[in-house]
Amino acid sequence: MVSIATSIIALFSGLLAVWAQFRISKSNRDFESFKLLEMKRLDSEFRSGIYKEPLLNAAFDLQSRVYNILNMNFFEVYYLLGSERQKHYAINNTVFLFSQYFAWAEAVRIDIQYIDLGSSEKTRELSLIQRYISSTLQTDRFNPVLMVFAGEQRAIGERMLKSIDGKVSCMGFGEYLSSEFDLHDPLIEMLTDEMKKVSSNVFEASERLSALQHGLIDMLDFLDPDFIRYPKERRKKV
């Protein structure tokens, strides 16, 4: 009887040891899975911040300039009636703002899988807004002034983007001017010529610019729905 009892105890102890080992092993696997998911989430948030914030800022800067062109006589004041310095700034900075938006739109288009919007549906919505903006600039249903084909938009964006130590960034306005980038790139020359046409007759480009500004506002509302970065009163559609 003692031998049987001893055997039962040994068997029970063995089963407990196996069960404990199984629980430890499962716990370790669960922890590793959790750790991998958490690392993936943090990496996604990090990459999301790399793209979302610059895209948001670029969209705001461009829509603000378009609003000023259409509603505040920006080109009349600073290009048609301005000094040489003001004329230079009015054209070149506006071309830069378009190019800056193209850059971050291209970066997002390439790495859209890294933009953490919480669901694939929201990611698709961002893509739809981007396509609307791109189509607005390339469509021939408006006056041909400021018509920029999708391939040209992407090419300009590619030229503006930089990668330093694996980090994506966009050329700043100072670098844009000091590198004389605007003087030697045929697509920038094309965009500059189109902008000069707009400055001479804003009405010809008003439909395209209005549709563009509306699309950019939609992007702001999508990326910053709670008006944390930019208040609602600074997002008026023309």
Name each region found by the language model:
Residues W19-V238:
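Conserved non-transmembrane functional hotspots
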Residues M1-N28:
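Short hydrophobic alpha-helical transmembrane segments
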